[in-house]
């Protein structure tokens, strides 16, 4: 475990260096480069030719330290999920360590470093693929095609909506540069009081959360419901068997947004493994 903390601190130093490179590259940028943002009120109202430097300091802008795979990290180090007591303590310890690093950098530089729960898209599968090539297939770590976003409960874990929100809320208090939680639900059109109950719980107990459902449509047969995935990660209509992507609309939330585009293999596998929380 000692080696883990040593490597983590080495990587944090590298992250700080990378973020400072980004900050320094922006210094001296004239407002003319994007008038709608810097001159016309999108972000500020600077004069023509005025540099944006003042807006990069004193916490006005954010240098985000992102992270994915808290679940996989806990599995790799302890062999358990971070929803167990032992795993939860370790995950929170790591998260607080990341936050402390951001706070320290902020104090040293006066810049707005923040800890950000990353909604990785291609990154979620890329990192997993690279680690699998380097370290081999590790159970509950690299044996899938994706890493879990930020601090989220793994999509395959059986947990009800309220327990999931309660568990993840404690990470919201640490990941102040950005955080969000989700619950997966079936068609709730005939059970709106239950939706209201979830929303009420979110309002009173967690910083930011959203509800996911599956409002898919097959344009060939008119089926509405959940378009399924077969073993080859191909979408098909469970009513008529249609596999033509142009003849269906599959709606899922990825990276915080509900969209109907098709996704990479890693994200598609993650979507297929999501369990319902109600």
Where are these regions (language model features)?
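Long, C-terminal-biased catalytic regions of enzyme "large/alpha" subunits
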Residues: 1-278
């Amino acid at each position: 475990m000692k080696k883990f903390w040593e490597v983590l601190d080495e990587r944090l130093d590298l992250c700080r260096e990378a973020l400072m490179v980004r900050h320094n590259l922006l210094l001296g940028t004239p407002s003319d480069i994007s008038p709608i943002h810097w001159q016309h009120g999108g972000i500020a109202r600077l004069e023509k030719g005025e540099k944006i430097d003042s807006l990069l300091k004193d916490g006005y802008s954010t240098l985000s330290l992102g992270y994915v795979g808290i679940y996989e990290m806990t599995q790799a180090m302890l062999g358990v999920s971070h929803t167990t007591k032992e795993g939860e303590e370790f995950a929170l310890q790591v998260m607080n360590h990341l936050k402390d690093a951001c706070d320290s950098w902020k104090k040293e530089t006066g810049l707005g470093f923040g800890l950000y729960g990353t909604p990785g898209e291609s990154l979620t599968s890329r990192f997993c693929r690279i680690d699998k090539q380097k370290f081999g297939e590790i159970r509950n770590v690299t044996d899938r095609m994706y890493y879990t976003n930020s601090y989220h409960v793994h999509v395959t874990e059986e947990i009800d909506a309220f327990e999931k929100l309660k568990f993840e809320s404690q990470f919201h208090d640490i990941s102040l540069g950005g955080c969000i939680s989700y619950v997966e639900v079936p068609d709730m059109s005939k059970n709106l009081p239950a939706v209201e109950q979830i929303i009420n719980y979110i309002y009173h107990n967690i910083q930011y959360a959203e509800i996911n459902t599956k409002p898919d449509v097959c344009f060939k047969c008119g089926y509405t419901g959940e378009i399924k995935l077969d073993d080859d990660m191909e979408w098909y209509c469970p009513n008529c068997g249609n596999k033509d992507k142009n003849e269906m609309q599959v709606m899922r939330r990825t990276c915080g947004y509900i969209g109907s585009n098709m996704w990479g293999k890693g994200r598609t596998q993650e979507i297929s493994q999501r369990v319902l929380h109600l």
